[in-house]
């Protein structure tokens, strides 16, 4: 039975809630415009303020039916409210199992008749959803062959090697984890890192292919969150 994983709880497996509707709003772009006298339209400064379009949060609205013993509804509602109401949670839809959302959840309303209770949970989530296993091992049971690819992020370098990192829609800075010193060339700029963990904020992974030239001898992992709208 399809449901939603909220934190460590699955809405059907743990609570026997029947998911009847999922509503997802589209995140509104944060635009910046100025009126200029004598100019048609407006001056759009949105992309000039940062290296990517920024978005407001989106809303996930999840509607469930309760069909278990009516005498347990109050007890179950108390359990659900204590577990998630007002809390920031990770949300994974069974229909989109390769990604997770992050946001704050509330119980919006509950109504009932003699046979069925209806529960609405709303989650104010970040605009991007993120791949569950970006930068690490991926699992067959969450892998979606239609919408996802297998991306290599761990490398053994012996000399100089060109590697390609495939990023999603959100522009982001990666973290490098290595067991030896390396020289990294990206976008015409050379960076030198020592063994250990280092996030390089000046490196901005663009959507699609990002090519690096790596020099050194050892193991290198590139970690980042691959965000999709």
Protein language model regions, located:
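Short beta-strand and beta-hairpin "edge-sheet" elements
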Residues: 27, 90-129
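Short, acidic/charged, Gly/Pro-enriched secondary-structure junctions
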Residues: 65-106
